[in-house]
């Protein structure tokens, strides 16, 4: 098992591809990315599927939207998807600096 989980709570696709592109460009891929879809009406899974062969990525769609009323609750349920020792909580519009 990898030690680092990159947790990305997601709702809008606007910047998600750029976020995942920045992660894919890293020299080391010793991490697993978890995408927690907050019951988005947008096709986030289509974006995520593009990265399946680039690094370890796990997509989970939640049926209930929590972001509007309990954003920290949505973050927590996304974190609970992972089992890694370390976590890094990203937003779906964050960029990872190149290593």
Protein language model regions, located:
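Short beta-strand/turn micro-motifs composed of small residues
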Residues: 8-10, 37
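Short, well-formed alpha-helical segments that are part of the catalytic scaffolds
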Residues: 12-25
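Acidic donor-binding/catalytic loop of UDP-sugar-dependent glycosyltransferases
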Residues: 42-43, 94-99
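Glycine-rich, basic loop-to-helix element that forms the pyrophosphate-binding segment
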Residues: 63-82
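Short beta-strand-to-loop acidic/aromatic patch adjacent to the donor-nucleotide binding site
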Residues: 84-95
């Amino acid at each position: 098992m990898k030690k680092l989980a990159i947790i990305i709570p997601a709702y809008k696709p606007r910047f998600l591809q750029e976020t995942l592109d920045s992660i894919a460009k890293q020299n080391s891929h010793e991490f697993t990315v978890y995408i927690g879809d907050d019951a988005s009406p947008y096709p986030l899974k289509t974006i995520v599927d593009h990265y399946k062969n680039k690094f370890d990525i796990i997509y989970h769609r939640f049926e209930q939207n929590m972001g509007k009323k309990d954003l920290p609750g949505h973050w927590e349920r996304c974190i609970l998807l992972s089992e890694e020792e370390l976590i890094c909580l990203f937003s779906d519009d964050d960029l990872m600096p190149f290593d």
